[in-house]
Amino acid sequence: HIGAQTMGSNLNTWLNFLKIWSTYENIIFRFTSGEFLATRPNAILYATPLSNTFWEIYNKALQEGLSVNEIIKTLGKKRNAINFLNVNNLESFDHYNTIEFRCPNATLNPVIWQNNLNLFTKLIMRCKSEVDSLLIDKRHDELVKNGIPDNLKLYNETINLRQALEFCDLIFTNNLDKVYFLKQYLKSFKISIEPYYRAKKFTRTI
């Protein structure tokens, strides 16, 4: 959970968030599978991919001039990769006023906790500034042509190094952050669709 006030009420921040998540969700899902090579089997029920939904809402917001509150209302399902139902005030520091990221696999590894938290917080902070919309549009068009958005099977079976590097450069300014992200995303370039199949260890023991 991350405080909703971190996102704030600026419309461009929310539009950037929808656009970036929609375009790089396949990268994010593989990363947040943590020490496992695939997302947990019940993710399709309890952390449903949002790529297509976010893209539709993004375009609707542009065409119809939706406000941030109207955007949030359209995202009101709990069992998605991100749960916005607890968002009640975009300026409040209330303990329960949170955005819940549900896509990560459960883990007892504190390094993976930190990596996941670092990704989500840096993603939100990046959305507060200008992004390369033309690049993101181009990448999203390529994904659609290949049937990738919302396809959890392809999220698990595909490693896209070029897209992952692009995402790293978009989100992180620190090279060490990029290294930690790529280690957890690439997982020694191994792929498995079997649930709970562990990747080769990529974190130090704490």
Task: Identify the residue ranges that each predicted region occupies.
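C-terminal accessory/tail domains of diverse enzymes
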Residues: 7-206
